[in-house]
Regions:
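Tandem CBS (Cystathionine beta-synthase) repeat/Bateman regulatory domains
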Residues: 1-154
Length: 154
């Protein structure tokens, strides 16, 4: 569980960025991992696993091939469940596994807003947008680090 700390300190997120404002003032732009790794709905799950491994991420934003707009999100858990259910990752398509219409957060939103959205929706990842479109991804570990400070074992 994330607890909000109102102390001003410098926190390094897992994205390797320092958040220098108190958590109450920091925004998603201070925290997100740019650029997001994306995939299309018609691609295979094996391609998603490959991209995740090489990008060092556990989720991909699924973009509509024609509009370039986010239409879903696929996570390592989605692929793991499919394989455990006997589906061939070289055959099953992203559109069959993805969570459609993902909740998206804007770069100007607060870290607290992200924590609330992620907690209520049981999300580990949120695609991040700005006026120019999709610009990043924020993970629950980034939000927790920003709110509670560096973990003792780091």
């Amino acid at each position: 569980m994330c607890q909000v700390s109102m102390e001003q300190n410098m926190t390094e997120t897992s994205a390797g960025q320092a958040v220098q404002q108190p958590p109450s003032q920091a925004t998603i732009a201070d925290l997100m991992r740019p650029p997001p790794t994306t995939i299309e709905p018609a691609d295979h799950a094996a391609a998603a696993a490959y991209l995740m491994k090489h990008a060092g991420t556990t989720a991909l934003v699924v973009l509509d091939a024609k509009t370039g707009q986010p239409v879903g999100i696929i996570t390592e858990a989605d692929i793991t469940h499919a394989v455990a259910d006997g589906k061939d990752p070289n055959e099953v398509r992203i559109h069959d596994l993805m969570t459609p219409d993902p909740t998206i957060i804007n770069t100007t939103a607060s870290i607290r807003d992200a924590a609330i959205i992620m907690t209520r929706g049981h999300f580990r990842h949120l695609p991040v947008t700005s006026d120019s479109g999709l610009v990043g991804m924020v993970e629950i570990t980034d939000v927790c680090r920003a709110l509670i400070g560096p973990f003792p074992f780091e």
